[in-house]
A protein has these predicted regions:
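N-terminal glycine-rich anion-binding loops that anchor highly charged ligand groups
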Residues: 2, 11-57, 64-73, 293
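Glycine-rich anion-binding loops and their surrounding alpha/beta cores
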Residues: 2, 7-10, 16-17, 62-70, ...
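Short glycine-rich or small-residue beta-strand-to-loop segments that form or flank ligand, phosphate
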Residues: 12, 43-47, 80-85, 301
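Short beta-strand segments at enzyme active-site cores
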Residues: 38-39, 109-112, 220
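A glycine-rich phosphate/pyrophosphate-binding beta-strand-loop-alpha-helix module
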Residues: 43, 92-148
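Active-site cofactor/substrate anionic-group-binding motifs, chiefly glycine-
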Residues: 50-113
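Acidic, glycine-rich active-site loops and adjacent beta-strand->loop/helix elements
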Residues: 83-88, 113-119, 158, 224-225, ...
Length: 339
């Protein structure tokens, strides 16, 4: 196995690591015996060189192996819906809302997330503001999924090995590979994924990496005006991923029968502001751009799951989940569950 100095030298020479070397790199980064200065140098050198798909694949495989068990049955056909963040959009937590609406449509959702890192309000912050308790352990998370069709896996509970990296990332103060690893390392390893990426190049990188992971299907999306979500603002790129294969295409909100909106229409605030906005959509009270945005995301999730054959069919099904009260009832059921 390569030593930390050998890995650092290779990165400084701008030579890519093999997947096996990337796994060795993660082992060094998560080893408490690795000096913080060396861990910081390795992270900075990798970021400066630029991460490539074989490296990201090796890192993701290593992190998945280190993750704590979730207690969720293997092989469950569920989806994770997440954005990388980092797009500076200040939106109202689109991925969290999309995840709840998708679950209300009957597709099991295992959302993996954290507190705010690159936005004013992360997915854990958002759920708590909605009155939803974060499952305290794997047993509670699995029980929540079985009872409601939705659960949240709080990343620090399942990836303790990376705890020592957090202060190093904070000191560096720049984007590192961990900003894009999170969406790839859901500890339950659901076979379906809807991932938003903050740049087109990162979307392609994540798609190429997912093609080497044990998945069934995933969409990696980069939105109009640099958003890390599909939105009604404008056309968005979709990388359609299956094992060993990536197909790219451009889609428009009009394909889904959704009218365009401005970025200002999707503006968010703090956790309480965002919770009020999302609750209004799920209760059927807001029929504007916020609703359209969640309908669009849910339609994509339903397509990934093979539940629909036409874009507008997905929108109709998501609309019905709101108008029938199913989305509101899901939120109420989640609020009633203990941590």
């Amino acid at each position: 196995m390569s030593t930390p100095r050998e890995l650092l030298q290779q990165l400084l020479e701008r030579r890519d690591l093999s997947p096996e070397q990337a796994q060795a790199l993660l082992a060094q980064l998560t080893d408490p015996q690795t000096p913080p200065a060396m861990a910081g140098a390795l992270l900075a050198a990798l970021s400066t060189k630029g991460v490539v798909a074989p490296e990201l694949l090796g890192l993701a495989l290593a992190m998945r192996r280190l993750a704590r068990p979730t207690g969720i049955p293997a092989g469950l056909r569920a989806i994770d819906i997440v954005g990388t963040g980092g797009d500076a959009s200040g939106s109202f937590n689109i991925s969290t809302g999309t995840a709840l609406l998708t679950a209300a449509c009957g597709v099991p959702v295992i959302k993996h997330g954290n507190r705010s890192v690159s936005s004013r309000c992360g997915s854990a912050d958002m759920l708590e503001a909605l009155g939803v308790a974060i499952p305290a352990n794997a047993e509670a998370a699995a029980a929540c999924l079985a009872a409601t069709g939705f659960t949240f896996l709080y990343a620090p509970h399942y990836h303790p090995a990376t705890a020592g990296v957090a202060p190093i990332r904070a000191v560096l103060g720049v984007r590192t590979v961990f900003n894009i690893l999170g969406p790839l390392v859901n500890p339950a390893q659901p076979p379906l994924h809807l991932i938003g990426a903050f740049s087109l190049s990162v979307a392609r990188l994540m798609a190429d990496t997912l093609a080497g992971l044990p998945i069934e299907r995933a969409f990696v999306v980069h939105g109009a005006e640099g958003w890390d979500e599909p939105t009604p603002i404008g056309p968005f790129t979709v990388f359609d991923v299956r094992p060993g294969r990536v197909d790219a295409g451009l889609r428009s909100p009009s394909d889904y029968g959704i009218k365009s909106c401005s970025a200002a229409d999707l503006a968010g605030g703090d956790a309480q502001d965002n919770a009020r906005a999302l609750q209004a959509v799920l209760a059927g009270e807001d029929r504007g751009a916020h609703r359209d945005c969640l309908l669009l995301g849910a339609a994509l999730a339903l397509e990934i799951a093979g539940e629909t054959r036409h874009p507008q069919e997905g929108v109709a099904r998501a609309s019905a989940a709101i108008d029938s009260g199913a989305a509101r009832r899901l939120l109420e059921a989640l609020r009633e569950r203990p941590a």
